[in-house]
Curated annotation (Swiss-Prot):
Subunit text: Probably interacts with PlsX.
Name under which the protein is recorded: Glycerol-3-phosphate acyltransferase
Family according to the record: Belongs to the PlsY family.
Spans traversing the lipid bilayer: 4-24, 70-90, 110-130, 158-178
Pfam families linked to this entry: G3P_acyltransf (PF02660)
GO biological process: phospholipid biosynthetic process
Any GO molecular function: acyl-phosphate glycerol-3-phosphate acyltransferase activity
Predominant cellular place of this UniProt entry's protein: membrane
Keywords associated with the record: Cell inner membrane, Cell membrane, Lipid biosynthesis, Lipid metabolism, Membrane, Phospholipid biosynthesis, Phospholipid metabolism, Transferase, Transmembrane, Transmembrane helix
Domain of life, per lineage: Bacteria
NCBIfam families: glycerol-3-phosphate 1-O-acyltransferase PlsY (TIGR00023)
The keyword Kinase is assigned to this record: no
């Protein structure tokens, strides 16, 4: 019971670190939640503050995911890895420090996959890059990657706990993109380089 609690709380607190919010405050003197899409993730930071801050957010958010995997590994089981990882994903998008708001958990999920099964991470990232090259729409690319991750986990015969994480995490990330999906269907989702014209 104590081990499960450590995995849940540790994973959640790692994921909840509000990287995008802090970078917005320190780098640009802004509240990123009131800019662009209102997300604290790297894509909204890119649109609002530029490449340098966005790269910093991307790297730190991915590191949060990798740290959650390390925590679960230290607890001694692949199931604890999955539990800590899932709660890191939740923590990123529902940060207790930001009124349970946050990002879409894409970078955090990438960090988790890199630490969990790097061939899966690289293949999934390749799918993301392909989607971006074809459409220049980050959200569409992220949705493709969320679908691809469990398929690649299965195709590469990864352990069952990791496959279940990819399934659950993929569904969660897709759910976090529901407003993006609405805009994609309406043809109003911005592409890379386009300014955000809607309210957060």
């Amino acid at each position: 019971m104590l081990t499960a609690l450590l995995a849940v709380l540790g994973g959640y607190l790692l994921g909840s670190i509000p990287t995008g919010y802090w970078v917005g405050r320190w780098w640009g003197g802004i509240d990123i939640r009131q800019q662009g899409s209102g997300s604290t993730g790297a894509t909204n930071v890119l649109r609002t503050l530029g490449k340098g801050p966005a790269l910093l957010v991307l790297l730190v958010d991915a590191a949060k995911g990798a740290a959650a995997v390390a925590l679960g590994s230290a607890l001694g089981s692949a199931w604890w890895v999955v539990l800590a990882a899932l709660f890191a994903v939740i923590g990123h998008s529902r940060s207790c420090w930001l009124g349970f708001r946050g990002g879409k958990s894409v970078a955090t999920s990438l960090g988790i996959l890199l630490a969990m099964a790097w061939p899966v991470a690289l293949t999934t990232f390749g799918v993301w890059l392909l989607g971006l090259a074809l459409t220049r729409i980050v959200s569409f690319s992220s949705l493709l990657a969320a679908v691809a991750a469990p398929v690649v986990m299965w195709a590469t015969a990864q352990p069952l706990p990791y496959l279940l994480f990819a399934l659950a995490g993929g569904v969660y990330v897709i759910g976090a993109h529901r407003r993006n999906i609405e805009r994609l269907l309406a043809g109003s989702e911005p592409r890379i380089g386009q300014k955000w014209t809607q309210s957060p």
